[in-house]
Amino acid sequence: MGIKVGVLGAKGRVGQTIVAAVNESDDLELVAEIGVDDDLSLLVDNGAEVVVDFTTPNAVMGNLEFCINNGISAVVGTTGFDDARLEQVRAWLEGKDNVGVLIAPNFAISAVLTMVFSKQAARFFESAEVIELHHPNKLDAPSGTAIHTAQGIAAARKEAGMDAQPDATEQALEGSRGASVDGIPVHAVRMSGMVAHEQVIFGTQGQTLTIKQDSYDRNSFAPGVLVGVRNIAQHPGLVVGLEHYLGL
């Protein structure tokens, strides 16, 4: 028997992709497909060991509290996690030594590598800005991926003892310089025809570096999600970022 998996948000586009990926995996067993009107108790009744959550920021915290209290580990792709929410998840996990929660801003391996490479490059360049581009139905802006990328860049700059990046702007239309995430400008584009894309632009004297990532289809998330499902038993507690499961 394989790992027993429940999918929350199973009727959504990403959820349907994850359901198909689990069904195609010999070492996983899909035991629950939970939609917005379904009772979470189905997870317990069907013996789910791990859930995958691609729901909404409004629903995810209640889902996590239920899963943790019932000893079910969770792989979470839902966005909207700030420091306060992460601290709440840690509090729920206290004393739950056999429960793991993986929260990742992006499960596409190319996006994870973009975040890692950006953090590595940050100390070599005076300036850095992040541009994320998504379909117009995305509920949050900027994306969790862009925020996580900018936070990593800012942390690397701080560790290297770098000053604030140069910007002589004195007058600007509101929002034209993007949102500041720990001092790194982040710009969000919402456009028909897009799925999920990110560009990180670095600059210093006489040269620039652009790291670009594109997800053209929601299937790009499935391999990373399955890495999380298969390995979460070895990672009790809260882990933020799939890179920690990939040895990066």
Swiss-Prot record:
The active site is at H134 (proton donor/acceptor), K138 (proton donor). Keywords: Amino-acid biosynthesis, Cytoplasm, Diaminopimelate biosynthesis, Lysine biosynthesis, NAD, NADP, Oxidoreductase. Pfam families: DapB_C (PF05173), DapB_N (PF01113). (S)-2,3,4,5-tetrahydrodipicolinate binds at H135, G144, T145. It comes from the Bacteria. PROSITE patterns: DAPB. Pathway: Amino-acid biosynthesis; L-lysine biosynthesis via DAP pathway; (S)-tetrahydrodipicolinate from L-aspartate: step 4/4. Coiled coil: none annotated. It is found in: Cytoplasm. The keyword RNA-binding does not apply. GO terms for molecular function: 4-hydroxy-tetrahydrodipicolinate reductase; NAD binding; NADP binding; oxidoreductase activity, acting on CH or CH2 groups, NAD or NADP as acceptor. InterPro entries: DapB_C (IPR022663), DapB_N (IPR000846), DapB_N_CS (IPR022664), DHDPR_bac (IPR023940), NAD(P)-bd_dom_sf (IPR036291). It catalyses: (S)-2,3,4,5-tetrahydrodipicolinate + NAD(+) + H2O = (2S,4S)-4-hydroxy-2,3,4,5-tetrahydrodipicolinate + NADH + H(+); (S)-2,3,4,5-tetrahydrodipicolinate + NADP(+) + H2O = (2S,4S)-4-hydroxy-2,3,4,5-tetrahydrodipicolinate + NADPH + H(+). Catalyzes the conversion of 4-hydroxy-tetrahydrodipicolinate (HTPA) to tetrahydrodipicolinate. This is 4-hydroxy-tetrahydrodipicolinate reductase. The gene is dapB.
